[in-house]
């Protein structure tokens, strides 16, 4: 595939992969990953441990070479040095020099980028303010809590106003207030045109901020699309007593269920079948106390997809 021209690169997706594959000896870590991340969108990359998420990120950052397939980042082949200067990255495992102040850590990364020295103070001030550390810039990192260090790591990722930011579990060390702050930062990034590639196990958080999601398992995408496209299912929770084990089993004709005590949730039940369900429960000797429509959450859909896969 020929390299795009400057005009094409500027209008191309933030990320585009075609059958991206990575093998380590006889182990397939990534098996034909194909996906597109538009610019200016928040993209959730989800999957269980061992699904291939970390391998995919390393390939996109140019830290690993693919076994097969292609990956383009900001219109250029993954790993292109000039393109990497336009990318911010917060790794899941972050550790900064404990003897340096927050400002010194940010200055070090300004130098590594490298950013023009004349812009350093402005960049550092903006990063500290954005992540809520404006009054701690002179303090040594060794005095910071883990949550404060994660905020600092996010500040590092934002230096230079990148066009694409990879965030790997960006709120794992934060309290609820900190998580709320980071969600706001992520939304602000998207509003200014920055694409955000978000890897998080906090699915409720992903549901709140992401425009688009891909679910991966065993190194391949098993579902993807906008949040609206992914969460199309309907569910109904019924509180019922008096059903025998056989009676409850016979209700499987109404679709997958999740039972807990007196409550049975039918995870893929169309609304027009609810009267039929209630009538069947009564016929089986059940006493129905409550029927509640339930919005399908991203966690519901995620678990359902993994079960089906």
Please identify what each model-predicted range represents:
Residues 1-21, 308-309:
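ABC-family P-loop ATPase nucleotide-binding domain
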Residues 12-17, 22-217, 221-223:
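ABC transporter nucleotide-binding domains
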Residues 222-227, 279:
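Intrinsically disordered, low-complexity boundary segments flanking structured domains
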